[in-house]
Amino acid sequence: MNKRLSALVGMLLLMLGLPCARAGLVNDIPSCYAASHFSFSSPLPNRLLYVLIDQATPLSPALQKSVIDNINHALGPATKFVIAEFSRTSNSHYLQVLHTGIIESPMTPSERSNVPVNALGGFDNCMRDQAFFAIHMADTTAQQILQAATGAPNQPNDILLALKTVAPVIAQDPARQKVLFLVSNGFENSSFAHFASGNLNPEQMLQQARTQGLLANFGGAQVFVLGAGITP
């Protein structure tokens, strides 16, 4: 691996170990195409994985592992991922995007044929390292959120508002395949509803959510939920 690509790997390692003020706002994974100074770049990702974790839903170690396994299964080339958390608690901890990353697409055969042979090895190594560090970043971030989760029957939690907030971001993303992976027990506890009270009329609550504009449109994204119904 040449010095330039070695520096990229070092940068990735540094990013995994240190907090970044801009983390989550931009792509936190440096580009192998840019590092190689090619005249072309990787196309936009055709897949989006948006992981949204409810900090008011503590999970067992087995379910935490299931979250990580599902993330790993969904990540691959040409994939953009977002790791975010939410929970309105006593310290005003609302929705926060912790990391956004892109695993780039490999070069097409036509592109490879126009790249000097001595540059291909370094690029291929960089792409392997990029995928490894992207998965490691997603896993570590998700694990930190899961391990810090706390739950209590009266803990404030605006699940519908969190979903409403991320919906436009997901809907407007140009990826052809979009997935929202929600980790939550689904117990809304806000000015809108208090599931712990046990006195809810589902049809009435659905109508109220519609009236208050709390129903989210994810633009055709698939939505998967892990943890539904788990009590704190």
Q: Where is each model-derived feature located?
A:
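Von Willebrand factor
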Residues: 24, 28-32, 45-176, 179-181, 188
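VWA/integrin I-like adhesion module and closely mimicked acidic/polar interface patches used
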Residues: 27, 187-232
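Bacterial N-terminal signal peptides that target proteins for export
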Residues: 1-9
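Bacterial N-terminal signal peptides
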Residues: 9-17
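N-terminal post-signal-peptidase region of extra-cytosolic proteins
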Residues: 63-71, 163-165, 203-211
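Acidic/histidine-rich, surface-exposed loop or edge segments in extracytoplasmic proteins
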Residues: 43-57, 141-150, 224-229
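Sec/Tat signal peptide C-region and signal peptidase I cleavage site
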Residues: 18-23
